[in-house]
């Protein structure tokens, strides 16, 4: 399965270039600060495998780290501190400086944790993402469940009825390639009109198993992505639509491709060639990816899109046009309450890692409050318990809340342009929250709730 065809292009920027990883293209030579930031991230990845989610920058920096002696975590924490001290005199652009500062707080936190300076779970999240999550009141989930209950046919336990409803709209694995290719093409066309596409971008999609996530974007550089869709559990049509938009257009693939073309290629900000998990950039990236489907498919087209997915997937319900449309309408009506219900994952992570609940207690919470069937609850908890994703679980829900508020403080007609900024700029959660506050103050009638950025972290994680 593939998206758009086209050959990758070298970075079009004046000045010296150097071979990128993979050896098929060049990138600008990084300035000293970006070089040392990249080295720090790659060195940390040797201690925390998977921290580097993607790297498409200079090949010699990766080779340097591969050949050198493993650097102690305490030394890496000192390296991060030294970079923070250098920021004011070496990085002139305010947005770039703020972005690097937030990233460095996270990297310093990870290094200090490795060195034995562990933080409480909430503090670890705050230092990692420049954002403090909040525990949801279970009444929110009860209200969402009541909305879903009213929309579902039949009687009996809600979890059973919801599982039975979802089973009617599962896409058979052998039909996934056809449906995914069609969705990718459709969403790419929409994204091209709204946001433009870098010349030569492309992606390919594969089906995988035995993963803790539903979908994953591996960005290779050269404007190329590999997208994996996990088939461990049945995939319902509406979830497939969300996942494809999230991972491709206008989600992760388009974000990474534009940032490579613009930030790295045109502006020479080589730090953006290193994609790091558990850093503030993830909160923004996941927020835009979650909301991407709302730009990929306008609200007035959602029902028609689902009906066509049912047809292309060869679902039995597609043979009855009226039943298919009714099913799509109910599914769309359940979208927002189901999203609210999914925020029970935030509480589950807090219960597990902050409150000290057992695996079984957390599993029971997900099934009771989140209305998840046992197999899906186990898969969610597997993700929550993974060392690398134990804090990452928050970025989907918190990122969506933050980015949605940021979009909604401007008129609807301005939101595609505003969303486009997320594809091109180095924005931090703190900067986005500040823009929300400024817009809300200027337009109090908009009624936007205040955003909740983290307070400025102490000079040393865990310090006073």
Question: Where are these predicted regions, by residue range?
Answer:
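N-terminal maturation segment of proteins
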Residues: 19-464
């Amino acid at each position: 399965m593939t998206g758009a065809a086209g050959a990758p292009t070298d970075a079009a920027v004046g000045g010296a270039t150097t071979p990128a990883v993979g050896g098929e293209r060049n990138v600008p030579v990084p300035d000293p600060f970006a070089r040392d930031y990249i080295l720090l991230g790659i060195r940390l990845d040797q201690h925390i495998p998977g921290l580097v989610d993607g790297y498409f920058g200079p090949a010699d920096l990766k080779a340097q780290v591969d050949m050198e002696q493993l650097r102690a975590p305490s030394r890496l924490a000192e390296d991060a501190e030294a970079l923070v001290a250098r920021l004011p005199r070496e990085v002139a652009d305010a947005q770039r400086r703020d972005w690097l500062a937030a990233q460095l707080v996270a990297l310093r936190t990870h290094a200090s944790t490795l060195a034995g300076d562990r933080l409480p779970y909430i503090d670890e999240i705050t230092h990692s993402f420049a954002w403090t999550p909040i525990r949801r009141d279970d009444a929110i989930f009860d209200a969402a469940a009541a909305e879903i209950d009213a929309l579902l046919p039949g009687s009996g336990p809600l979890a059973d009825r919801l599982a039975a409803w979802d089973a009617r709209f599962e896409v058979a694995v052998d039909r996934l390639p056809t449906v995914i290719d069609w969705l990718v093409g459709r969403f790419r066309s929409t994204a091209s009109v709204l946001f433009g596409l870098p010349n030569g971008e492309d992606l390919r999609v594969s089906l995988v198993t035995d993963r803790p996530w539903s979908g994953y974007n591996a960005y290779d550089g050269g404007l190329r992505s590999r997208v994996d869709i996990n088939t461990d559990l049945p995939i319902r049509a509406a979830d497939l639509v969300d996942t494809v938009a999230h991972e491709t257009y206008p989600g992760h693939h388009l974000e990474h491709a534009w940032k490579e073309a613009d930030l790295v290629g045109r502006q020479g900000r080589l730090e953006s060639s290193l994609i790091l998990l558990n850093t503030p950039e993830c909160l923004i990236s996941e927020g835009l990816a979650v909301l991407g489907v709302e730009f990929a498919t306008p609200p007035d087209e959602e029902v028609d899109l689902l009906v066509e997915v049912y047809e292309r997937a060869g679902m039995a319900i597609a043979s009855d046009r009226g039943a298919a449309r009714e099913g799509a309408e109910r599914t769309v009506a359940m979208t927002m309450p189901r999203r609210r219900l999914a925020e029970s994952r935030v509480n589950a992570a807090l219960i597990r890692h902050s409150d000290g609940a057992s695996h079984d207690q957390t599993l029971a919470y997900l099934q009771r409050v989140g209305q998840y069937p046992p197999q899906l609850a186990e898969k969610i908890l597997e993700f929550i318990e993974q060392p690398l994703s134990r804090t990452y679980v928050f970025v989907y829900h918190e990122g969506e809340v933050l980015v949605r508020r940021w979009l909604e403080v401007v008129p609807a007609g301005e939101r595609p342009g505003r969303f486009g900024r997320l594809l091109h700029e180095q924005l931090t959660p703190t900067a986005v929250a500040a823009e929300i506050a400024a817009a809300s103050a200027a337009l109090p009638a908009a009624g936007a709730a205040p955003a909740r950025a983290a307070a400025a972290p102490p000079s040393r994680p865990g310090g006073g």
